Regions:
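Active-site glycine- and acidic-residue-rich loops that bind
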Residues: 141-143, 248-251
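Acidic/glycine-rich phosphate/pyrophosphate-binding loops and surrounding catalytic core
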Residues: 2-215, 220, 229-237, 243, ...
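Active-site loop ensemble at the mouth of alpha/beta enzyme cores that anchors a bound cofactor
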Residues: 281-285
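Glycine-rich beta-strand-to-loop/alpha-helix junction loops that act as flexible
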Residues: 223-224, 244-250, 268-270
Length: 285
């Protein structure tokens, strides 16, 4: 995962680009009917139960739009919320509140949905050693927020992008001429370029597991699209040589049994690509 400083930089970029996209040369609806001296107050209202996420993001958005806006936070990121709860109040320039409204809601609704789903998955893993991981199957331009939401929901972050970890998947292996060649070429490249990156290698069957184990320097083996029986066999083969990760269509119905196979991690793209926004609204008071 990237550093906290890099993550903050990504979030700032998301905010700047989203405001550019949404506001453009001006919010003419507000400019047309609301005086620039008008002051107002609004509440962020919960309309669906779940795990709230994006409160810190909302504060950043309000500050970016207008540093004079005052935000009173009543409920923090990661808390369980129910219908009727008020997460925060924002007060100040009415025009500024309206300018920030859509980005705040878009971000918080999406982040809260992801945090809620992640939390449900973590509950299913209780009593096992497995931890839930996200993937790169994120909304383009929104990745930092979605990965933050996974953490808020109790999950762990996989690599952020293509540059903070090496992950040799099926196509890399096939293009490189096989597992052993792909691993050796990767280790040579990292040594020659002075890059200190962990290496994950995907295995499609037990034979590939055995071949991966012949090479040193692999941080984690991705056990991809294995059934339960073969996953257990893979975990036994790997032992303490490196960490293990199950992936491939794992959902609420199957995650517990995969965890009980003894893997260290389970990665699921569904955390970020198959969620429905949590219903939130910003209402004038």
């Amino acid at each position: 995962m990237i550093s906290e400083a890099k993550l903050n930089e990504e979030v700032e970029g998301i905010i700047a680009n989203a405001i550019r996209e949404d506001v453009g040369p001006g919010d003419y609806s507000s400019l047309a009917c609301i005086p620039d001296t008008a002051q107002g107050k609004a509440k962020l209202l919960v309309k669906e139960k779940g795990i709230i996420a994006g409160v810190a993001f909302a504060q950043k958005v309000f500050a970016y739009v207008d540093e004079a806006l005052e935000v009173e936070v009543l409920i923090q990121d990661g808390a369980e919320v129910k219908v009727g709860d008020i997460v925060l109040y924002v007060s100040g320039s009415s025009q500024s509140i309206l300018k920030a409204e859509r980005l705040v809601l878009n971000g918080m609704q999406r982040m809260s949905a992801i945090a809620t789903k992640t939390n449900a998955y973590t509950q299913l893993l209780q009593g096992t050693k497995a931890k839930i991981l996200d993937t790169r199957k994120t909304t383009p331009g929104f990745r930092a927020l979605e990965k933050m939401a996974v953490k808020i929901g109790g999950g762990e972050n996989h690599r952020f992008a293509l540059y903070d970890m090496v992950m040799l998947k099926d196509n890399h292996i096939d293009f490189a001429g096989g597992i052993t060649k792909a691993i050796e070429k990767t280790k040579n490249y990292l040594k020659e370029t002075g890059r200190d990156l962990k290496i994950i290698v995907e295995a499609r069957d037990l034979g590939e597991i055995k071949e991966i184990l012949l090479s040193e320097g692999v941080y984690r083996i991705l056990i991809d699209n294995f059934n339960y029986e073969d996953t257990r066999k893979a975990v036994q083969l790997i032992g303490d040589t490196c960490l293990t990760e199950s992936s491939g269509g794992i959902n609420e119905k199957t995650i517990r049994e995969y965890a009980e196979c003894g893997v260290d991690f389970i990665s699921s793209g569904a955390l970020t690509h198959s969620v429905y926004n949590l219903d939130l609204s910003l209402k004038a008071v």
